[in-house]
Amino acid sequence: MTSDWKEFTLGDITDLVIDYRGKTPKKLGGDWSKSGYRALSAKNIKTGRIVQPDTIRYVDEEMYQKWMKDEVKRGDILITSEAPFGQIFFWDSDEKIVLSQRLFCVRIKSEYDPRFIYYYMITPEFQGELDGRATGTTVVGLRQPELMKCKIRCPEIQNQKAIAEILSSIDAKILANDKINDNLQQQASALFDSFYKRAIVEVGFTEIIQILGGGTPKTGESSYWNGLIPFFTPKDV
């Protein structure tokens, strides 16, 4: 029962916060590299995923040592502070990375299961509190002190681990299905491209389609409404 769960602030259960949001290679006397250590920024984090891999930059060994006085470790939680705001990622790798723009790294105390904390942080309850603590109008962002005030509710450690294991297995299945779908989409695209290149007849798009315009029944005519046939508007598509 969740009524038995204890409530803490994120700061209560956090061992370390890594925050290098103001750093850049130029400020450290260097520049980006063509290869080396990946530098992840907020735009590369979407809850549960690394995205836009083509935008990821790199630094060499010397720059990495200057930049990352505290290193990201397996089990850490990455949180975007703005643009986009409130995206969460569980770092489940031994790869060494650089924390770049608009990104916090939170390390949870050993008495708590970090994967469970990650799953709690992506719940509507926690995300709603993040929204409430954010500031800004044009660009919405979150300051570290406000992040640490956010509330976390936890069961006993054995239950944390059990819940995290179940949710992790579901995530793994989703990821596997996504990879299958990506592969099928690539195959379909390649097959279509092959057919397209062999086409010998070219026609205009409007020659093979029929365009139908919609309308709205009179709202004052009750016989037009509350029937069994669905009525779609643009917002339903």
Question: What is the meaning of each model-derived region?
Answer:
Residues Q52, L99, E146, Q187-A188:
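N-terminal alpha-helical segment
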Residues E7-G30, K43-R74, T206-S222, P230, ...:
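Sequence-specific dsDNA recognition surfaces
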Residues G36, T55, S100-R102, L228:
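A generic structural signal for short beta-strands and their flanking turns/coil linkers
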Residues M1-K23, K149, R153-G215:
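Non-catalytic DNA-recognition/assembly elements of restriction-modification systems
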Residues S41-A42, Y58-F126, R143, T233-P234:
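A short beta-sheet element
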Residues I45-K46, A83-F85, T135-G136, G214:
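Short glycine-enriched loops at secondary-structure junctions
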Residues S3, S81, I97-F104, R115, ...:
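A short glycine-rich beta-alpha junction/loop motif
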